[in-house]
Amino acid sequence: VEKKQLPHMLCVTNLLLHGIEVPSQIVHDNTLARPLRDYTAADRVNVILTNPPFGGIEEPGIEAGFPADVRTKETADLFLVLIQHLLKPGGRAAVVLPDGFLFGEGVKARIKEQLLQHCNLHTIVRLPGGVFAPYTGIKTNLLFFTKGQPTQHIWYYEHPYPPGVKNYNKTKPIRIEEFDAEKAW
């Protein structure tokens, strides 16, 4: 599901170019517009891997589809509530979130509390600046968690720049080889 027209079109075009004749699984819609209570057991999944949009504000009324204690217009916060809801027991998630989520108060704190109580947040990898340049310079984190058990211990790792690198950008992006320390762990 993709809310914005251009990314939706690019995704469908990419699938067509790679031999998927009818990419019917790619829907142009707002995932957050469906009230949480309307999701059933059939909608639950084992794995969610996502980079939800952050820094965005949802259109009026979207937050009404979420429980009162976690209502917000902040897109990334609503996605984290939805992700927790959609995971089956034992389901796993990897989510890219900004620093603002980790250190925020109010609704963010309540969402984090629910995450820690209902999921085992076992790993946080803090990414260096520029990883998503030129689209955003916001510092980001990778959160890995499994639904069904409360959090006991969190492995926190700050991913360093390699020697000689001061920042990432569009022409010099982060490379997969730079994650060897995380893979070895």
Place the predicted regions along the sequence by residue.
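S-adenosyl-L-methionine
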Residues: 6-42
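A conserved structural/catalytic subdomain of Rossmann-like adenosyl-cofactor enzymes
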Residues: 36-185
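Conserved acidic E/D residue at the C-terminus of a beta-strand in Rossmann-like folds
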Residues: 1-2
